[in-house]
Amino acid sequence: GGLPLQVPDAVSDQQALWHYYQQWQPEWQPGTMRNYSNASIGLFGLLAVKNSGLSFADYLQKKVLQPLKMTHTYIDVPAAAQKNYAWGYYNGKPMRVSGGMLDAEAYGVKTSAQDMAKYLQANIDPDSTPALKQAILTSQARYLRVGNWYQGLGWEIYHWPVDAKEVIAASDNGVALKPHAVEVLMPAAKTDAQSWVHKTGSTNGFGSYIAFVPQQKVGIVMLANKRYPNPARVEAAHKIITALAKH
């Protein structure tokens, strides 16, 4: 509908957040355009846990991190784990992720490569984690068609094999952050193992990337304490996954 990339700085508490969404007016008719928005992703996370009576952080811990045994993943890094918490770098200066409204729901997870490998494995093989199987399949279903790719719940999905140039071009912020016309799939197309499934993530001091092909049972997680261009992440990952898929 046209929500902004981030929740406006003036929205600083829960009451103001609900007021912001209540008075917000869509720029386009629902289901016609796709525009990347942490304000939208964060709202989805907030609403997903609303009836549980738990905070997003507690729900994540109980329903996702514990079943996957992701013991080094946090919203707020505890004192005992601070020694392992990397500094990010932006313009040569050390920094950490800054908090804000919906940071937990949209971009606030801190994790390790080992824990992300567990998350990656669960998404490649949902049968390996029965407690999360349905949620994983739901997240990888195809809800919108955007040109040559599909929108899952967070995930961006291409049919495999895919030309690296397509994914690289679409991941550039000059393209990824612009609005695009979409086709709503009704009903949503079910999860297809013959897919390239991926998601980039960035804050000022950090850059991350996850991509996998369930059919090939291969995937990659890239975590860096520097923000660097999405196309470079995609290009490297595609080369690695393509090579692994041949063996």
Q: Which positions does each model-derived feature cover?
A:
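Second-shell loop/turn segments in exported
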Residues: P4-P8, Q29-M33, G45-K50, A104-Y107, ...
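Catalytic loop of the DD-peptidase/beta-lactamase superfamily, centered on the K-T-G motif
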Residues: V49-L54, D58-K62, Q66, R96-H247
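Active-site-proximal loop and beta-strand segments within enzyme catalytic domains
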Residues: G1-N38, L54, K62, A79-G100, ...
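Short active-site loop at a secondary-structure junction
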Residues: P26-S40, A104-Y107, Y209, K217
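A short, well-structured edge-of-sheet supersecondary motif
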Residues: L3-Q14, T71-T73, A211-V213, I220-V221
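Amphipathic, well-packed alpha-helical segments that form the structural scaffold of globular domains
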Residues: W18-P26, G45, V49, Q121
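Well-ordered alpha-helical segments within folded domains of soluble proteins
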Residues: S40-G45, A117
